């Protein structure tokens, strides 16, 4: 006998996961959407509050503009507008905000990278929960590697046999595999290696969500 719903599984996992994951100063987010599906849970280890600068939240446009200036080091307004396809007035608004917060400097008719954005967390772990359909869960969890240091599939233990038999695929994709029983017992079948997230923009989006939720 297994769980009746995925939400039932997620709710119990939230209570029980600390037995397998020792994370200090943690924050737990549900239904996290950053552009590659919706992660059921994201658990982050926050930096000390003294390290987090309080300011107005950066939008996705602000972050995209920041990344362009950072990568190019020196860029004109027209180039940023062309790359993003966003209205010039919105780009100007983002650049003004980035200048105010010292991420960017104005130099004549150009914008120059100034200071690196500091993430609000030390690490984060994404979880995709499923009652069955382990292949679908695996592919979804793999997408979370764009922003997560670690990504896991969490399956109902009652329906996990096929996934366990295909453990080499989890290892190949570096996605962890956990099962949870209806009495809250979590078993870890594969612990992925820490891997640098693939998309800095998505990491920044998550960081902003954490600071301003």
Outline where the language-model segments fall:
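Amphipathic coiled-coil/heptad-repeat helices and related helical stalk/stem segments
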Residues: 91, 137, 162-163
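Helix-rich interaction surfaces within compact, conserved domain-sized segments
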Residues: 175-212
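Nucleic-acid nuclease catalytic cores
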Residues: 133, 148-183
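Acidic-basic catalytic patches of nuclease active cores, encompassing PD-(D/E)XK
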Residues: 1-47, 57-110, 213
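Active-site beta-strand-loop-beta-strand hairpin of nuclease catalytic cores
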Residues: 44-51, 94, 115-126, 134-135, ...
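Short amphipathic alpha-helical segments and helix-helix/interface helices
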Residues: 14, 141, 164-167
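Short amphipathic alpha-helical boundary/capping segments
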Residues: 52-56
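Short hydrophobic-acidic sequence motifs that mark active-site Asp/Glu residues
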Residues: 38, 126-128
């Amino acid at each position: 006998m297994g769980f009746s719903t995925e939400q039932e599984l997620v709710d119990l996992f939230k209570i029980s996961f600390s037995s397998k994951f020792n994370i200090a100063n943690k924050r737990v987010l549900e239904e996290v959407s950053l552009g590659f599906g919706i992660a059921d849970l994201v658990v982050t280890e926050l930096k000390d509050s003294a390290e987090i600068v309080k300011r107005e939240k950066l939008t996705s446009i602000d972050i995209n503009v920041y990344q362009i200036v950072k990568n190019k080091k020196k860029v004109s307004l027209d180039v940023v507008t062309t790359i993003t396809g966003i209205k010039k007035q919105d780009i100007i608004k983002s650049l003004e905000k980035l200048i105010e917060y010292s991420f960017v400097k104005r130099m004549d008719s150009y914008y120059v990278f100034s200071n690196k954005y500091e993430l609000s967390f030390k690490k984060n772990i994404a979880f995709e929960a499923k009652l069955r359909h382990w292949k679908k869960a695996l592919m979804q969890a793999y997408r979370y590697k764009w922003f997560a240091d670690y990504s896991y599939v969490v399956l109902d233990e009652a329906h996990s046999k096929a996934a366990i038999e295909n453990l080499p695929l989890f290892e190949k994709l570096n996605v962890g595999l956990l099962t949870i029983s209806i009495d809250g017992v979590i078993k870890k079948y594969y612990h992925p290696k820490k891997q640098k997230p693939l998309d800095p923009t998505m990491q920044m989006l998550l960081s902003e969500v954490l600071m301003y939720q």
